[in-house]
Amino acid sequence: MKGKSSVMEKLAEVVSLKLNKHLKMEGIELIKLKLGVEIIFINISKLAILFLVSYYFGLIKETIIMLAAFGFLRSNAFGLHAKNSIVCTVMSLLMFVLGAYLSKYLLFNNYMVLASFIIVNLLLFRYAPGDTEAHPLVGAKLRDKLKKQAVLMGMLLMAITLIIPDELIKTCISLSSYFEIISILPITYKVLGRRYKNYYEFERTIKQS
């Protein structure tokens, strides 16, 4: 993975330097530009791996649906991130390729969808949004706003899933919603040895300074 990271770093440096001929950035701003470009390239490479594997197994449609549903909820509920690119890629394959494969055999009907989303929305109301050490969600107003929006997104996704006639799509969306919920549960933080409610530490530091 060091070789891959080195390639990404070099590629990001080349692209950022070319961009900087027009942007004229210096110092910390140039470093931020390079890091931003590198993150984009890393995410593109992870998506490419995900789509290639799902295409190989004939699951591309299901994988895209699961990614879209997951991203829809995560945009406001947030949640844990993997600590490195390899773990992130492996977890993505497990969730969105293996999950897509399992969806073909589980096949949720509307009763199962309704029961699933009642649980999902209750857990969103209780635990969303989930933050990380690198991205603490500072401010009670912000967290309250994100919580309300996350529940609203959950309700909207439930309505869409109930309306969709295809049981395979219903199952893909439901499983993706479970995966997002898992990423915000306190037990998940505890099992993975990650700090929960990171904004506490951040806000306490601000008050002490």
Curated annotation (Swiss-Prot):
Residue ranges of the TM segments: 49-71, 82-102, 105-125, 149-169, 173-193
Any matching Pfam family:
AgrB
- What does the record say about its membrane topology? Multi-pass membrane protein
Q: What class of enzyme is it?
A: hydrolase
One cellular-component annotation, GO: plasma membrane
Domain of life from the UniProt record: Bacteria
Q: What InterPro entries would the database entry show?
A: AgrB (IPR006741)
Query: One of this protein's GO BP terms?
Result: quorum sensing
An example of a GO molecular function for this protein is: peptidase activity
Record key words, sorted? Cell membrane, Hydrolase, Membrane, Protease, Quorum sensing, Transmembrane, Transmembrane helix
Q: What is its EC number?
A: 3.4.-.-
Q: Where in the cell is it found?
A: Cell membrane
* Role noted for this protein: May be involved in the proteolytic processing of a quorum sensing system signal molecule precursor.
HAMAP family from the UniProt entry: AgrB
* Assigned protein family: Belongs to the AgrB family.
Which protein, by its recorded name, is this? Putative AgrB-like protein
